[in-house]
Amino acid sequence: MENKFLSGSSELFSSLYNNTNTNSNNNNNNNNNNNNNNNINNTTTTTTTTTSNNNLKNNFSNKNNFSFNNSSNSLSSSFGVPSSPPPQKLNNSGYNFNSSSYSSLVPNIKKRSNSLDDNMSVPTLQNFTNNNNNNNNNNNNNNNNNSNNNSSNNNNNNNNNNNFNNSPTSSPTPYVPTTPLINSYPSSPFLINQQPLSSSTPFPFNHQPYHIHPFTTLSLNNSNGINNNNHNNNHNNSNNNNNNNSNSNSNNHNNHNNNNQSIVPQSIHLQSTTPQIQPLSLQPPQQLPTINGPTSTPPSSSNSTTTTTTTTTTPSTNENSNNNNNSYNTNNNNKPEIQLIDSGAILECFIELRDLGSSISKQSKESMVSGDFANGLERIKVTLSTLTNKIETLDLSIQNIIQNEPRSRIFGNSSDESRVPVLTRPRRFRKSKVKSKENNHHNNNNNNINNININNNNCSTPLLQSPQLSSSSPSLNSSHDGDQHLSSPQLSSSTPQHKSNGNGNTNSTNNNKRKIGELKQCTSCGTTSSPEWRKGPAGNQSLCNACGLYFAKLVRREASLTWKPQSVVSVNDLLCAGKDQKQSNTTSQLTTFINSVEHNQQIFQQQQQQQQQQQQQQQQQQQQQQQQQNHHHQQLQQQQQQQQQQQLHH
């Protein structure tokens, strides 16, 4: 925020001294202002100062003029609008802003208490009236603010400054921001309304525009405005040296050494457009780069130097140099001492370095995702500063260790057993596990052998009659004096049945050694730890679980690929069989076709025969019908003949 404020307000300062004031001949008004300021200096309480109508008119004539009202420590700005009555002061918690003045033009302003710090109080901001005549000469002439005014005005200004210095103050005057920010986002955060400065506008500083001096302070005058005597500089286009209290052509050179350290903004003359105003930033300044420009006035004499203490650096300004070489000497005495690190904490420090590096990458990724590159860069700067400090501390610590401990473990000597372990990925199967298992087996076997010897010495019964229990429960052996001896649990696999002869101990040790030497090991991957052992090409339980499953899969695949029929058939037989099969197929097809044709012929013949038979039957039926008809006709004729004969007889 401070960087945006200072960079954004640099252009306002570049046009700070380009104002044309219309009240250069108002000597009466100036005298009235001086009288009012004398009254203020005689009292220690804050009073409300009034300005004449002429001064108000002069203020209102400048449209881009900012006026700061000191009544009840409130800020007000007017853009050609009459000033409001003085607001009331709140209960030491903030300032009551009038809705028609500054708060209406500057929304969302942050209210603060009367003190920026516990030991710093906000000074009274006076009513701003320009009673000076700034003659910006392009011909290398000095711009003395009060050069055209009466000498009485200069004397009054000097008296006012002396009275201000003699007034009792409980604490040094704090830092007050000089100008509000100009909102030119998003196209450019540094240009004012996207309009470049005119060619006739001279830059008051001997440096590039858009930059502001980090320790630039304006003197506070008690004459109802700003004492611009501390800025009697050469404002010209030929880049002359700007020295406070050194290049003035008037007789006021010795009267400008006033110990005024508070900052009050001057009137700002921008171009024809009205800027958009952001809230004032009341945060104290931080460490900024050194830029040549007008600086604060020195105390008491021109040969003395002023030191402005910030958070990290203490710059000193040489006000009396004619070449305007403002040198800022940084005191490194306040830097904390580096604590050396012990050789045992080197590993932890390197882990911190690794974490800091990864955090930088994470922060850059977050800024790329969110698009907030400004805040992301600030976070990366903080992390990088801690990283560089850690590296410097490690460098000094390692150099000290090299000098004092030449055989330290930071060199990673292989002979040193207590060296810092290397952070590497552990292997899947460690040999240390095998060693630990062998050691456990040796210990168990030794315990079993000792228990057997104790039982042989203490028991009256033979060893064959002593109870042998399983591996899950301990064995209880009775002694001759009636006490019970609890032996360690004996594994059934490591304690075979012993004979009653004297060679039982030797046989048990030989068997145990043989079983220890026969630790299972996978013939494929070489591992000695597996939840289950499987069959392999070397025999049963020769492969670990994973290798055995893969081997079984391969065996099944080979069996499916290498299947052969029971009767071995040659290639010729297979070819001949194929030919025979083809021939048989063709013959079968022919036979089926012939059979089908014959069958069709038979069916056709049968159909023809049936048709012939039907025709014959029909013919026979017709013949029979004709015969019957003929017979019937003959009978009728005979009857008729008989009747005729009978008639003839009668």
Swiss-Prot record:
Keyword GTP-binding: no
Compositional bias ranges of the Polar residues kind: 116-129, 261-272
Presence of the UniProt keyword Ribonucleoprotein in the record: no
One Gene Ontology term of the molecular function aspect: transcription cis-regulatory region binding
GO BP annotations listed: regulation of transcription by RNA polymerase II
InterPro entries listed in its UniProt record: Znf_GATA, Znf_NHR/GATA
Pfam families, per database record: GATA
Biased composition (Low complexity): 16-79, 130-180, 221-260, 273-334, 442-511
Disulfide topology: none
Region (Disordered): 16-96, 111-181, 221-335, 409-515, 619-650
Domain of life: Eukaryota
Alphabetic keyword roster: Metal-binding, Transcription, Transcription regulation, Zinc, Zinc-finger
Zn-finger (GATA-type) residues: 522-547
Biased composition (Basic residues): 425-434
Cellular component annotations (GO), alphabetically ordered: nucleus
UniProt name for this protein: GATA zinc finger domain-containing protein 11
Species, as recorded: Dictyostelium discoideum
Gene name of the record: gtaK
